[in-house]
Amino acid sequence: MRVCIVAEGCYPFVVGGVSSWIHSMIRLFPNTEFVILAIAANRSLRGKYAYELPENVSEVYELYLQDVDWSKKHRRRQRLKKEQYRALRSLILDQDVQWNVLFDLFQKNDVSLNDILMGEDFLHAVTDCYNLKYSQLVFSDFLWTMRSIYLPLFITFQMELPKADLYHCVATGYAGVLGSMAKHIYGSRLLVSEHGIYTREREEELIKAKWVNGIYKNIWIDQFRKMSKLAYQESSLVTSLFEQARQLQIELGCPPEKIAVTPNGIRVENLQNI
């Protein structure tokens, strides 16, 4: 069996609770082959691992959310097909998002992120969103914010995906998008384990952030909610550590029947002399 662990901002780059849990889990299954799909901010972390990888880790794939699409910058621009444009518009307006069409667009076609983000189709879809929800804002600011929001998601859409029997995402967010896309492409199973609730953590960060103001905070938060809802919908099983976290997952769109609460284990024998 081949298992792909999909992790954002932790293993194998950073030491921490989630990273240690992943490392221990891999070592507990020495006869299972693991592949790591690790998401980092940029290439400064390339190959800089905080852990010595176990022998049953066969490959590590790295995705950088702040990567730049220079290699295809000067390709001839092409308009999207009607189905592709409808899917793009559904994503931006968050109206019955056609994720699988978008996965196929970026995985099966030689598209340039620059051409998508700077093209007429993206402009038209953003304009529709602006007119429906945000016409009180300055349009140029809104447009560039939307480009900033969708660049890391579109980079994620283009990621080369290792084939595996099971994709285990240790958060929703971009990891959940990758797992959902891999499920669509390979027909594999998807498992999501949340130690913290990704959407709530990003929401708290954005509320405190100085780099984004006013209603733009809400637009970013909605983007993370959208991605998390995808992961919940596509997963076969979603785990959380306690009941309150389970309730948050339900509020964020996870079907209750998919959720299992798996509290952190305690070695009782270590406490018997207390």
Give a label for each model feature.
Residues M1-V126, Y130:
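N-terminal subdomain of nucleotide-sugar transferases
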